[in-house]
């Protein structure tokens, strides 16, 4: 598998994006793995890698790029992500405020930037695209 991080230009600045795909072949159907409220993290990169192993070109964009690439990782003693409703009020409100700063229009704009990036010569096809995530 080929894994890399790239900065994809958007009207609001560079968007860090994790990309994974097979070593050989292509063009691959593209799949966008959309992050959840917590932001991008290793678990999402692993989901993308698993999808990539069966012949897809996977992208995990940092949709919080306008806010400085925020990532939340609150874990319990067993290193599992803590549920949002188990956070104290201050952390809970901080995460909701971050998520509230991301609109549907922004996600659509960022998705368009991903498509433009692929169309600029990546070994992927925008003729057949999919998405998973939140």
Give short role names for the model-derived ranges.
Residues 1-134:
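N-terminal cap/leader regions of alpha/beta-hydrolase-fold enzymes
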